[in-house]
């Protein structure tokens, strides 16, 4: 019988309340990595749940406890892009809906780097649209304001070409899939709007890690 997967969660004992730029991401490493090191041998895989090209991902991969046991490590950013590329058709693109305006530049650069510089790779990426909210606003701001901004960002993204998948570009957007779906249906109609894949990076990352652990990749 297959073993059941147990998920445990880690939050740094200190550090930025919200990752709103690259400096925050870098600062969070200094709080997370020392606290994580003592537990690296206890777990089979690791998911960094910050939607960015977070420096903790490559740093964890370099840790001896990770390398010697070939434990898989990924981030929700990387997992969402990989999943999107697998679920869309060859003539479709994927895009990202994120929080503050600064993430437009950061995630565009990070996605280009992740995909590589080939012309074909860039054709698969529709771009980034942002809500103007930060991660904490997604749950602290009035619900109707969050819904309005999310749906506006989704509709702008859908105007950028034949989009087949939309990545939720912040861990704080978990559970907002239906909000994104509503915007897709409003913009494209029931049939086309229902066809769009909405990719939650946390779910994509967990699915990839489970497969990697079971297969030994």
Language-model features, listed with the residues they occupy:
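Short, acidic/small-residue loops that bind anionic groups at enzyme active sites
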Residues: 60-88, 183-206
């Amino acid at each position: 019988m297959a073993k059941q997967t147990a998920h445990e969660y880690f939050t740094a004992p200190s550090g930025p309340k919200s990752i709103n730029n690259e400096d925050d991401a870098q600062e969070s490493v200094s709080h997370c990595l020392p606290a994580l090191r003592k537990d690296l041998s206890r777990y089979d895989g690791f998911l960094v749940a910050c939607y960015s090209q977070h420096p903790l991902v490559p740093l964890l991969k370099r840790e001896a406890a990770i390398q010697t046991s070939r434990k898989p490590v990924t981030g929700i950013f990387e997992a969402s892009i990989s999943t999107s590329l697998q679920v869309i058709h060859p003539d479709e693109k994927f895009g990202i809906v994120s929080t503050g305006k600064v993430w437009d530049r950061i995630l565009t650069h990070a996605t280009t780097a992740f995909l590589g510089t080939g012309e074909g790779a860039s054709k698969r990426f529709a771009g980034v649209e942002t809500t103007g909210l930060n991660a904490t606003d997604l749950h602290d701001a009035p619900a109707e304001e969050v819904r309005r901004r999310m749906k506006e960002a989704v509709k702008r993204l859908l105007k950028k070409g034949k989009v087949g998948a939309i990545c939720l570009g912040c861990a704080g957007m978990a559970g907002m899939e239906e909000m994104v779906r509503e915007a897709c249906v409003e913009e494209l109609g029931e049939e086309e709007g229902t066809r769009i894949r909405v990719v939650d990076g946390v779910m994509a990352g967990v699915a990839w890690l489970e497969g990697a652990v079971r297969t030994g990749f």
